[in-house]
């Protein structure tokens, strides 16, 4: 484990009048959002907070930082280690450090978008550890705006999981159908871990696998989805981001990009339909 000494212990918070005041703290846990994956979108507050921590970890299983950004993060904030699922879900070592030193857990996107990190925040509070949050731009914010659909017309967000052997989880698809029945759009995040264990190197789900999972889920529930048009959003928030709107077959045949998500539209008004069709 890398122990880093910082000469600065300065942090800023809002005073009673809404202005910034400088505070000092020698210990605690910082949940720091890095933004969508292009560190150019990382806030100055996030960089400053991470620099001021003595221990820095990059959470590596709920989201994925592109390989070319790893060295850049090191340049921005200093040395860090990657933490996978066991260290986050069993955070005793993390908490022991946070009781006596400043500890940063850096997360791609916004740190409180995943329930994993909300749970960590609550457990830290129960353990008497002060927990600070530096928010970042989330995939939810980027995608809903970029595709041109109204954010208030989205239903529950789902994550499409890899099949595990013979087992295929249909609950994500059931939520998509529930949203459609309510005339709501669905943001579908794609699984990063074929093992489901959160310990190995991540392997983002491809568009072809995602479409296959949708079709198998539909077959299992005897629902016909072959007339669906969906949006594929790739590498969002990065210079190479791409949006494509088309049929299931068209989406499945796209090989470009590295990290993807889907938007499955519900009922669209005229403006939303026009906005979405520009991505065909």
Question: Which residues fall in each region the model found?
Answer:
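Class I S-adenosyl-L-methionine
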Residues: 3-6, 11-130, 134
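A generic local secondary-structure boundary/capping motif
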Residues: 19-20, 46-47, 95, 173-178, ...
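A contiguous loop/helix-start segment that scaffolds small-molecule binding in enzyme catalytic cores
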Residues: 29, 178-280
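Conserved active-site and cofactor/substrate-binding residues in soluble primary-metabolism enzymes
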Residues: 41, 45, 68, 89, ...
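Short glycine-/acidic-enriched loop or helix-start segments at secondary-structure transitions
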Residues: 41-43, 67-69, 115-117, 143, ...
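Short, surface-exposed amphipathic charged segments that create phosphate/polyanion-binding patches used
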Residues: 94-100, 146-150, 167-174, 201, ...
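Class I SAM-dependent methyltransferase SAM-binding "motif I" and its flanking Rossmann-like core
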Residues: 109-186
